[in-house]
């Protein structure tokens, strides 16, 4: 988590003060439940809240204690005792460190997911707006990077909209997966604490009780969460890569907004590079990389070890902060994307009508030619055009084999660009709904 790629809204979730505040709330809510069950005095639970609810925890002091104890939760509860006083002896009754750490981690992950869902909504709004602006803007579709058949630029953006809609649903599911709480004691048996304490804390923290924990919440939940972030990052990169290709000088169908005073190169003043898209490509690699340790964290020894801990202290903040930044950058990129319909049309025309070859093939078979013959007739006229030697429609009209099946007028009708877009409305309704 470095400032260059960090937004304050997401960073605040992972700040030490936020973490200690959540730790306190977990401990205090547990004390409330213990008090209701008669395990600790009710006045003690009230005092814990009264003394520390609005406290600013002394991070330097906690660090000082941890240097001696070598244990972060003990360092925190020791500092909490300094704030609360004698009633602090009722804090952490029957609990283990993982109850606090894991429940806190899941609170942070769910809060991060809420921000990421809002980020995706920004991307979706930008994509929808630009898709409708260019719903019928003709452009060339490419397979293997080579001209294939016409599409519209609106369809390109609609593809991305559908992908990010799926990403949103996956993230909602991943949020639910980690929205669990464990207050079950040393090895998850509730030997020293009533399960009703867990139920109370879970409700208070906006979580669900973990059905069965060991000393930790099972890490397959977290693996799914971080894998989902990795998939979303891949969707970010897919769209960024599309923009990078479209901005190449010889293509130039779309271009990142270039602001006044912006410089593209320290050496070449003419340069306008797709730096935002390239940046997103690199950030996506990092988010995907964080999914790997999350997968490996699933494999813990027996009821618990802490091999997961060091990894999670890094991947939790880094993955969510990085993806949050990337999604917001992507939304802004799409909102300001420069789109060049004239260049799209010029590129459509570059191959002299070859983009209609499949329609010619189908028409010939419908007129009685075998598919093999029709393919041969069309291809032998297409190849000279591919080499820049003539116009496709003109060559077809001179081909005696083609003329056996079709008139010049019938051939000409097959070069209608609008034919390829007759179902755009249907696709848009599928993607965006009837509205």
Predicted regions and their residues:
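A helix-coil-helix interface module used to build multimeric assemblies
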Residues: 1-184, 190, 194-200, 209, ...
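A structural signal for small-residue-enriched, beta-sheet-centric alpha/beta enzyme cores
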Residues: 189, 209-216, 345, 361, ...
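Short amphipathic alpha-helical segments with heptad-repeat character
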Residues: 110-121, 128, 158-161, 165, ...
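Conserved hydrophobic residue
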Residues: 40, 45, 251-252, 370
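Short, well-ordered beta-strand elements within core beta-sheets of diverse protein domains
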Residues: 155, 223-231, 359-367
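Generic, well-ordered alpha-helical scaffold segments in large soluble proteins
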Residues: 29, 33, 79, 83, ...
């Amino acid at each position: 988590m470095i400032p260059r790629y960090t937004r304050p809204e997401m960073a605040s979730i992972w700040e030490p003060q936020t973490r200690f505040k959540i730790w306190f709330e977990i401990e205090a809510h547990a004390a409330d439940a213990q008090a209701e069950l008669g395990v600790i005095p009710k006045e003690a639970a009230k005092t814990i809240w009264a003394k520390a609810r609005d406290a600013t925890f002394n991070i330097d002091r906690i660090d000082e204690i941890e240097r001696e104890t070598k244990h972060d939760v003990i360092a925190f509860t020791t500092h909490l005792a300094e704030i609360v006083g004698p009633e602090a002896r009722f804090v952490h009754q029957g609990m283990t460190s993982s109850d606090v750490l894991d429940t806190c981690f899941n609170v942070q992950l769910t809060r991060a997911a809420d921000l990421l869902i809002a980020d995706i909504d920004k991307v979706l709004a930008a994509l929808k707006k630009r898709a409708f602006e260019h719903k019928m803007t003709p452009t060339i579709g490419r397979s293997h990077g080579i001209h294939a058949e016409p599409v519209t630029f609106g369809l390109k953006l609609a593809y991305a909209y559908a992908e990010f809609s799926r990403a949103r649903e996956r993230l909602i599911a991943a949020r639910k997966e980690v929205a669990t709480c464990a207050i079950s004691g040393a090895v998850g048996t509730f030997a020293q604490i009533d399960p009703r304490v867990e139920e109370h804390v879970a409700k208070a923290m906006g979580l669900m009780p973990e059905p069965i924990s060991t000393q930790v919440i099972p890490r397959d939940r977290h693996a799914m969460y971080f894998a989902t972030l990795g998939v979303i990052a891949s969707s970010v990169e897919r769209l960024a890569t599309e923009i990078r290709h479209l901005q190449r000088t010889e293509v130039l169908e779309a271009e990142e907004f270039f602001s006044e005073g912006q410089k593209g190169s320290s050496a070449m003043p003419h340069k306008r590079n797709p730096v935002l898209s390239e940046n997103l490509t690199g950030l996506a690699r990092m988010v995907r990389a964080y999914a790997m340790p999350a997968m490996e964290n699933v494999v813990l020894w027996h009821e618990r070890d802490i091999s997961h801990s060091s990894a999670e202290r890094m991947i939790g903040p880094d993955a969510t902060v990085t993806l949050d930044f990337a999604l917001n950058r992507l939304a802004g990129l799409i909102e300001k994307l420069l789109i060049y319909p004239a260049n799209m049309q010029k590129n459509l025309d570059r191959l002299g009508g070859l983009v209609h070859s499949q329609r010619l093939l189908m028409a010939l078979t419908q007129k009685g030619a075998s598919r093999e013959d029709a393919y041969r007739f069309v291809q032998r006229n297409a190849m000279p055009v591919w080499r820049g030697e003539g116009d496709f429609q003109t060559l077809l009209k001179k081909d005696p084999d083609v003329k056996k099946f079709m008139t010049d007028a019938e051939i000409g009708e097959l070069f209608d660009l609008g034919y390829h877009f007759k179902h755009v409305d249907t696709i848009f309704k599928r993607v965006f709904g009837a509205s």
